[in-house]
Amino acid sequence: ERMKTALAYVREGHLGRCLVAKAWESTKQGSIGRQPDGEAPKEVDYDMWLGSAPKRPFNPRRFHGSWRWFFDYGAGDLGNDGVHRLDMAFAALSAAVETEGGEPLRMPRRISGTGGKWYFDDAQEWPDTMQVTYEYPGTPPRILTYEMRIWSPYKYLGEGEGAAVFGDRGYIILGNRGWRAYTNGGKMVKEHGGD
């Protein structure tokens, strides 16, 4: 419902011409720490759990709850939560482009990124800080940026996790529990709660 009403608002043309969208994760997550390898719990068929992943000794940090932080099993926070925020930003930016008479966005023509494991001193392998830029073809091109700071104790545009699309007449912020629309002067003109 949240995305349906947000996209309807964007398709009504309230944002004007939109060139840029942003998705972000700026919620503080704790360190996963370091633990020594050990024995898998008796009720776990660890070989089955590993599947086709490289064989590694059992470690509680590479198991349920934190497996996503290791190259062999997951994709870090970009693949865990980031994909949901990117999906919101992409859908709203594509709706804006279509409203302007353009083709829906498809594959980016260029992707660049930077980041690293700069904050946590723990067993996690994936970055804890990252910025990625997706450039979509068109005249003019459109840009979607993703920013991840999983050590950050503060919100961005009022949301710890979210997406936004910026136009020359206004912008929309999409959060986990609803969305808010603003004029180009920053006055909130519409708010919608719910999932």
Residue ranges and their predicted role:
Residues 4-11, 16-76, 80-195:
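Contiguous beta-strand/loop segments that form the cofactor/metal-binding neighborhood of enzyme cores
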